[in-house]
Amino acid sequence: MSKKYLINLLFLFLLFFCNFLNAAEIQKNRAIILTDIEADPDDTQSLVRLLLYSNQIDLKGLIATTSCWHRDIVNPESIEKVIRAYGKVHANLSKHEAGFPGMDALLKLVKSGIPKYGMLGVGEDKDSEGSDWIIKILEEKDERPLWISVWGGVNTLAQALYKIKNIKSEVEVKNLIAKLRVYTISDQDDSGIWIRNNFPDLFYIVTPGDDYA
């Protein structure tokens, strides 16, 4: 086997490998997190784990919400606290693998949902920084699905969908809904069933809570 052949083979391998890396970068899943952080310790723990893998996904939002355990307050400052701790180890994480977002970039993704429980926070004049942010990201010219990972209540998403349905054409609503992927382990307020009843075509993974069908 000639030296030239080996060099060409190595070049093709490197070219394939670089293309593979570029494709992997392009195909990162977009995700917005809804969290009732401070309801109990688990969401803080989950956020720490998420940031350790934040180079593997394209984070688009970190939204503080209410839930059945956290009915009338949201805590974006607690999300920011975890991000600032992440900022202290960002350089070390980046030594091991590329692509970890910077602290400042993540802080810009922190938003607040309405500090009301469930459907009390859905309807006319119930828009929040968080619900408007979901719409903004959903309207971006990006063909990748937008995953909504729900760790608490889902009324911030419900309000975004309520507004979309009221300001968009039927075709626009259908196209935006088709881009959404919702994953929540259970219902933590009554807005989840409202979403499923009013948007039956929405991709929505859930084990319904005890109080909601």
Where are these regions (language model features)?
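Positively charged n-region of N-terminal signal peptides that target proteins for export
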Residues: 1-5
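Bacterial N-terminal signal peptides
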Residues: 8-19
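N-terminal acidic, glycine/proline-rich low-complexity segments
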Residues: 23-213
